[in-house]
Amino acid sequence: MESEDLSGRELTIDSIMNKVRDIKNKFKNEDLTDELSLNKISADTTDNSGTVNQIMMMANNPEDWLSLLLKLEKNSVPLSDALLNKLIGRYSQAIEALPPDKYGQNESFARIQVRFAELKAIQEPDDARDYFQMARANCKKFAFVHISFAQFELSQGNVKKSKQLLQKAVERGAVPLEMLEIALRNLNLQKKQLLSEEEKKNLSASTVLTAQESFSGSLGHLQNRNNSCDSRGQTTKARFLYGENMPPQDAEIGYRNSLRQTNKTKQSCPFGRVPVNLLNSPDCDVKTDDSVVPCFMKRQTSRSECRDLVVPGSKPSGNDSCELRNLKSVQNSHFKEPLVSDEKSSELIITDSITLKNKTESSLLAKLEETKEYQEPEVPESNQKQWQSKRKSECINQNPAASSNHWQIPELARKVNTEQKHTTFEQPVFSVSKQSPPISTSKWFDPKSICKTPSSNTLDDYMSCFRTPVVKNDFPPACQLSTPYGQPACFQQQQHQILATPLQNLQVLASSSANECISVKGRIYSILKQIGSGGSSKVFQVLNEKKQIYAIKYVNLEEADNQTLDSYRNEIAYLNKLQQHSDKIIRLYDYEITDQYIYMVMECGNIDLNSWLKKKKSIDPWERKSYWKNMLEAVHTIHQHGIVHSDLKPANFLIVDGMLKLIDFGIANQMQPDTTSVVKDSQVGTVNYMPPEAIKDMSSSRENGKSKSKISPKSDVWSLGCILYYMTYGKTPFQQIINQISKLHAIIDPNHEIEFPDIPEKDLQDVLKCCLKRDPKQRISIPELLAHPYVQIQTHPVNQMAKGTTEEMKYVLGQLVGLNSPNSILKAAKTLYEHYSGGESHNSSSSKTFEKKRGKK
């Protein structure tokens, strides 16, 4: 019976393979045309919408995006302001199109995030820090991500912060560890570059030798396997040799690229750029034994076909069918040779992905599910024990796909350093289906065993050590508690509340579970979605037990330093103090603070001002005036209570029901009653919104050899003026200056004139000129701004209109009150309607008309 079933399944698989072959033949003739057209589009740096659309419509994976972005960057030399803005826009588009929860373990995705932050550092270093933090949170396992962030902080003069980043990367187990150790050593030696070119080469060579020795023993059971090889093989080996975790999802993505770049020329390191080669660079291109490291066959120039079916113990034959137990996936991989290759650079390798029909693909998946029990690869018993012990120690299944079905993938341990620290690497022993991405994407997480994270465009693995309980059910009397990002499958089912254990590496999933809840001081809140993130915090939209909407801000304190802790404590204190005095301050309803986390239950807004400005192509003058008045009232409130915000920017204001409210007092400073300014130990704030007096002057204002900067309420006026300037002209006053040193000099230079292009609203232009005066003594104050004609929304005409309307109503009622007959009232009302519809008001003629009507009666 089993033999008959096996034969039936073999016939079914053969028929599916024939369908795949037919589809491939159908698209085969289109390969060259697609390649030429795609090259033509990619070469055009002025408009890449065609390539972008093709990437998003086909695979939409990080490799394709990275290839396109590197090509654009190569063609954007020398880098001008316009090209920089275009590059940043493309990188931003790529990040928005790639969900971090899906690609957080992908090297190309990590490089896109890092490079985007580096480009932002060239344009706006103050904003770049947030993007470096985002890259570090999304892709924490890659050492080069942490080093790039540390390099940026070092370039900003924050040596202590740079060292903290590297040390935390070591604690997190980022790979390769040797790269982090070299960076730390160079930092201690006070070198400007954390990694030099020579160190990169030495690091690459030593890592290769160590990895080869380690893998020779670990992969002994694979020595008899013959594998086909593709152009990505060297990249896969390089990633393998760096000891990086490569989940099956990442592997699957890597072999279905429609754009691919094999080699990349070494480029100079601009502002903050970490001198780390791409792992597929020539420096990392190493020769390894094909019997030890699996690879995939490149498609020959003669277009000979090679099916990625691996038969253990025998060489692959030309026959398209094979034994069912040896089948891993059904696919036709075909790649193209590089168009041009030399020692310095190579062109893009164009590969055409074949897209199956939905019906065929779903049928293929169904048949593969039916035959999964026959496809389980044989794994040595010693390795099986190693996987089991590893999974038990971690308490979390890092590969739910491997447990949900029986396509297990060996997890190989590699020694990282002399302290016996280990990292794991998952390498598929069979090829991965190019035509069937849902196999890995749909089964990478098991929805039944994962408490999903509400997220829209959020961090992948950052908030992994939550301590606050999260309820799995909708407000039960006694319920099991977990973390908002936990995976409940690893916990025992109990009736009591179970808290998450420390130091868990939990995977974040983007979609939200409808019954996921958070507990704050015993109150249960049901999470709807994630609405924001930044640094070590995230914001969720939640429902309380009365079905009222709130926002809960979560702050992870495990990586926070003392300054960060103080900033959050100040924020809570300021919110509690100020929300009682103004409705322009965001409301804080409840909070919970521990050594590991902070939860703040706050008023839920619609969108922050920064995001709103980016989405709006043009701003209505009335909206701008209304929001400006809201900002003035909010800042006036904090100034009345002796608080200078010192870091005002659009992101600090939240739109709530059409009203702007001030949020985020993280770095606010409370002034003493007898002082008019605050001397700060370090420069804070955003450069584009930073007042001249807040910029450090190394030649003056020194105390004990340490530079100081002064801030006052007038400093917030400058920042508000920059925000209003942005709302008026679509940019900040000094945004066009890319070089940060030049920008700082321009801000404090009285000879540098700020442009105020003519606008119809002359009172608005006057407000901008009064706010953006470099001398704080000459700068306008908040009370004066509140009394400025621009803020007075046509007070006098409105009063006159109201007065006129009152007189009109009195006149109409006076005319109607003397009429007794319904017909007379109807005629009088009709006459009044005709008069007012024609734009007329009551006058002598209308009075005579009514008098005549009344006389007739």
Curated annotation (Swiss-Prot):
Expression tissues: Present in rapidly proliferating cell lines.
Residue ranges, compositional bias (Low complexity): 836-847
Biological processes annotated in GO: chromosome segregation; female meiosis chromosome segregation; meiotic spindle assembly checkpoint signaling; mitotic spindle assembly checkpoint signaling; mitotic spindle organization; positive regulation of cell population proliferation; positive regulation of SMAD protein signal transduction; protein localization to kinetochore
Region (Disordered): 371-410, 836-857
Modified residues (Phosphothreonine): T33, T360
UniProt-annotated binding residues for ATP: I531, G532, S533, G534, G535, S536, S537, K538, V539, K553
Listed Gene3D superfamilies: Phosphorylase Kinase, domain 1, Tetratricopeptide repeat domain, Transferase(Phosphotransferase) domain 1
Residue list for modification N-acetylmethionine: M1
Domain of life: Eukaryota
Catalytic EC class: transferase
Pfam (any one): Pkinase
Residues annotated with Phosphoserine modification: S7, S37, S80, S281, S317, S321, S363, S393, S436, S455, S821
Location of the Protein kinase domain: 525-791
Documented activity regulation: Inhibited by the ATP-competitive kinase inhibitor, SP600125.
Family matches, as CDD domains: PKc_Mps1
Annotated active site: D647 (proton acceptor)
Reaction catalyzed: L-seryl-[protein] + ATP = O-phospho-L-seryl-[protein] + ADP + H(+); L-threonyl-[protein] + ATP = O-phospho-L-threonyl-[protein] + ADP + H(+); L-tyrosyl-[protein] + ATP = O-phospho-L-tyrosyl-[protein] + ADP + H(+)
Polar residues: bias regions: 395-407
Outcome of mutating T686A: Loss of kinase activity
Family, as annotated: Belongs to the protein kinase superfamily. Ser/Thr protein kinase family.
Protein's job: Involved in mitotic spindle assembly checkpoint signaling, a process that delays anaphase until chromosomes are bioriented on the spindle, and in the repair of incorrect mitotic kinetochore-spindle microtubule attachments. Phosphorylates MAD1L1 to promote the mitotic spindle assembly checkpoint. Phosphorylates CDCA8/Borealin leading to enhanced AURKB activity at the kinetochore. Phosphorylates SKA3 at 'Ser-34' leading to dissociation of the SKA complex from microtubules and destabilization of microtubule-kinetochore attachments. Phosphorylates KNL1, KNTC1 and autophosphorylates.
Protein name: Dual specificity protein kinase TTK
Native organism: Homo sapiens (Human)
Gene name in the database record: TTK
